[in-house]
């Protein structure tokens, strides 16, 4: 969902994925460029070449640390996931020499009033041109356990709606 939202606010979006067959799908959602995460040299220096204006990181771990070292001056990084690890290995250099900001996103504890305000903003002000084309599927709650392996193996693209009825 990050690619269409960023595209809606007129930023050039580079989507990064480890799924080699996802390029056309991500470009359809608004990515100007698609790069393979597995081909990125994460480096180990306190500051690497400044590449990104900002980042939305779903993975955490080494990738999040790399983003802190490669975001351009005054860029923001939104950390929204931890699938690649809980640890963050970096220095203070990106924060004090480049003014990079790291924003932790906790969507679970958001008060109801703020949640409604944010969803209204997304629905009315940040509508991406291809939002209806985000891949999605619906499964019954009873089928959830058998669906998990595909997620663990990285074979799922898009969103899954669990029907509780």
Residues of each region from the PLM?
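Adenosine-nucleotide cofactor-binding segment
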Residues: 8-63, 120
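Glycine-rich phosphate-binding loop and adjacent beta-alpha segment
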Residues: 26, 62-130, 163-165
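Conserved beta-strand scaffold positions in the cores of enzyme catalytic domains, especially
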Residues: 34, 102-104, 138
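Short beta->alpha linker loops
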Residues: 17-18, 38-39, 58-59, 83, ...
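C-terminal hydrophobic helical "lid"/dimerization subdomain
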Residues: 116-165
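Short catalytic-loop micro-motif centered on adjacent basic/acidic residues
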Residues: 15, 53-56, 76-79, 104, ...
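Rossmann-fold NAD(P)-dependent oxidoreductase module
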Residues: 1-5
């Amino acid at each position: 969902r990050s690619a269409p939202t960023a595209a809606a606010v007129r930023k050039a979006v580079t989507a990064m994925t480890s799924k080699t067959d996802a390029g056309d799908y991500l470009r359809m959602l608004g990515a100007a460029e698609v790069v393979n995460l597995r081909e990125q040299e994460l480096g180990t220096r306190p500051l690497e070449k400044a590449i990104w204006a900002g980042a939305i990181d779903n993975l955490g771990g080494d990738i999040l640390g790399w983003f802190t070292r490669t975001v351009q001056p005054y860029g923001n990084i939104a950390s929204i996931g931890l699938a690649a690890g809980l640890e963050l290995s970096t220095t203070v250099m990106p924060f004090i020499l480049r003014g990079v900001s790291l924003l932790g996103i906790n969507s679970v504890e958001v008060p109801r009033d703020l949640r409604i305000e944010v969803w209204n903003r997304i629905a009315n002000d940040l509508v991406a041109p291809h939002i209806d084309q985000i891949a999605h599927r619906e499964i019954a709650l009873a089928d959830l356990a058998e669906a998990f392996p595909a997620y663990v193996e990285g074979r799922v693209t898009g969103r899954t709606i669990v029907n509780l009825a």
